[in-house]
């Protein structure tokens, strides 16, 4: 499956637990919605993913990717140290100039 470079980096940096490199996938004003919370800007996003990486040690296995213009959805099998692992989640991206402007994680 062919993925945009930023989505490949998003997956790779999560696999190696590099929260700083993960945050670099996002624009300065990016917004992330996950687990009922909103995270605004690179600094908050880096703190969110650092906590998530430490708590869940999750890995993503891409199952499907659909794109329409700047909007796309990655469906992935997510495994890690959390109840119900593995689960299938959808990552709804809005990509702008090769960086993620908006991400919403849903089941």
Placement of each model-derived feature along the sequence:
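Core segments of small alpha/beta cavity-forming domains
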Residues: 5-8, 20-21
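Short, well-ordered alpha-helical segments enriched in acidic and aromatic residues
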Residues: 16-29
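A short gly/proline-enriched turn/hairpin at secondary-structure junctions
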Residues: 31-40
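Hydrophobic/anchoring residues in structured secondary elements
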Residues: 32, 65-67, 105
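Surface-exposed, charged secondary-structure patches
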Residues: 49-90
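Short beta-strand edge/turn micro-motifs at domain boundaries
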Residues: 88-107
């Amino acid at each position: 499956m062919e993925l945009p470079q930023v989505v490949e980096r998003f997956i790779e940096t999560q696999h190696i637990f590099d929260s700083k490199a993960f945050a670099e996938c996002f624009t300065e004003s990016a917004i992330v919605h996950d687990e009922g919370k909103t995270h605004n800007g690179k600094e908050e996003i880096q703190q969110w993913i650092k906590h998530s990486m430490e708590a869940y040690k999750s890995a993503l296995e891409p199952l499907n990717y659909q794109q329409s213009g700047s909007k796309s959805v990655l469906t992935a099998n997510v495994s890690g140290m959390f109840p119900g692992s593995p689960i299938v989640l959808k990552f709804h991206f809005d990509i702008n100039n090769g960086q993620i402007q908006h991400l919403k994680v849903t089941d």
